Swiss-Prot record:
Belongs to the glutamate 5-kinase family. It comes from Rhizobium etli (strain CIAT 652). This is Glutamate 5-kinase. One of its GO terms (molecular function) is ATP binding. CDD domains: AAK_G5K_ProB (cd04242), PUA_G5K (cd21157). Residues 281-358 form the PUA domain. The keyword Transmembrane helix does not apply. Catalyzes the transfer of a phosphate group to glutamate to form L-glutamate 5-phosphate. GO terms for cellular component: cytosol. Substrate binds at S56, D143, N155.
Amino acid sequence: MTSRKPLARYRRIVIKIGSALLVDRKAGLKKAWLDAMCADIAGLKAKGIDVLVVSSGAIALGRSVLDLPSGALKLEESQAAAAVGQIALARAWSESLSRDEIVAGQILLTLGDTEERRRYLNARATINQLLKIGAVPIINENDTVATSEIRYGDNDRLAARVATMTGADLLILLSDIDGLYTAPPHLDPNATFLETIAEITPDIEAMAGGAASELSRGGMRTKIDAGKIATTSGCAMIIASGKPDSPLSSIENGARSSWFAPSGTPVTARKIWIAGQLQPAGELHVDDGAVTALGAGKSLLPAGVRSVSGLFSRGDTVAIVGPEGREIARGLVSYDAEDARRIAGRKSAEIEAILGYAGRAAMVHRDDMVMSAQLRQKSERQKKDAAHA
């Protein structure tokens, strides 16, 4: 089992913040708490860590602004509250992060943005670009248009999907409880706190309770569901209390929290998903030079593609076939079939002139590709030969 490590040793962290932490039912936004939270985020970024925030609170904040009554809201009421609250929430994050000269970027997702491959790739590219320029993506479900049939249902699971989408190696769920207990502690005074969870078993799932606040849709059950999504994709998860000011600093200073161990690594888990669960929609036939490049761990460029077969869309899975007619790799293609045919055999610098838009340099990026066992073995032999040369 992978051991727990300090936050500073992670590469990319997704932080989910519950509504009850950000919004007081009567007083509205908890500005002082948010400022302290953003100072924590600035501290992580100063250490070179990518930080993404999945922030609940739009409906809760809009509810406060509109002075809606307590209790369950009708769908149209919650969507109206989200429309009002999302503006205020984005402004609050932007203002607090700007205190440390950090730019915030708002992203509102719906279920299809992570479940449909084409939209998934587009959302991931946008998030990665924000991280590349040093911004902090502030992500929330688009509650104004989401319905009960087409929604994540809670931001715990949304945060887990964002973590897997972006290859994060840590997901932190901040809530009004400090971690996982063997039973709901407010119901069972003898409940035992669990500091480390090596694997999410049926017994672990049975320990989850329900939501504790009208401002929040989630509860321990949704956090365990999020843990299953994250850990099986190679991402560790922490459940911790967000009640103290500077909750991330509190975690670093030893505050009690539950740590869920990952299985594998984010890249390994995603490549297993590509190789084993998706059927190729087409084929890219490549030359010997491309085979050598892929064996060295590089992306597939249009120049190495000899021909294209099949009908596919950007984001679909395609098989990469070598000169001998054998599949040597499989991956998510960056272009529709028609455009792929037009740029096959051409240099990446020519793409914009041919297609009329600046597409991606790689036909299949190495992060979206898994090599066949045969090519992996050949690559390993080449590395060993080079080492002994």
